[in-house]
Amino acid sequence: MDDLWEQMAAVARELALAHFEAPPVEPLVLALHYGIPIVPSDGAALWHTDAEHPCLHYDRGQFPLRARFTAAHELLEMLSALGYLDFAVPRELADRSEALYQHGAAELLMPGPLLVAEGEAGDWDLGQLQRAFRVSWEALGRNVLRHVEAVLTIVDNGAVYCRVSSPGLRTPAALDPAERVAVDRAYAAWPSPGSQAVAGPHLRVRAWPVLPERQGVRRVVVLARPTEGD
């Protein structure tokens, strides 16, 4: 199963890099490249095809970043069904197909080589990366963890919403004091768009406000990276 996930990521990455040299990767541009019409829709994004009429419906009512991710997912599924991609979900794993194409969508929109190049150039400034790749903060943060050793924390209205680490790195249950200071500073400066950087004994921490706040939720995204030698 792990091989299938890697194959999906590799196919999506190859597709993105074949058409884009820098972010953002645009799924609708890719669809048009393959001659697939885009049909604006007020309902859920989906695709359908028959022998002569492939078509991708794009949900214009969705939050824009979510709509891009959904379009990437549907495009990969459609290109696979049409035989443009060297990828297929085995019948016995059909119940995992949605998760697989979600995984592929993340790699399509944030192909590893482009993400690493942009990340290293900007010292993994999530604010810059989010603007460059035009994806949600959570999707970006989770993908960044595949390429840099760090702990990602998302805080909503002062409470931890999720906390995850890079593979092989332990996820402490509680926030480090440096993380807490960065979070507190981000909320104190709200709605300033600037990030808050804090250097602790063992961690380099940076916190970004997610603006504008949505539905009364003030979200702060925190990336904590071990200091060299730890």
Describe these PLM feature segments.
Residues 1-230:
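Active-site hotspot residues in diverse enzymes, especially metal/ion-binding acidic/histidine motifs
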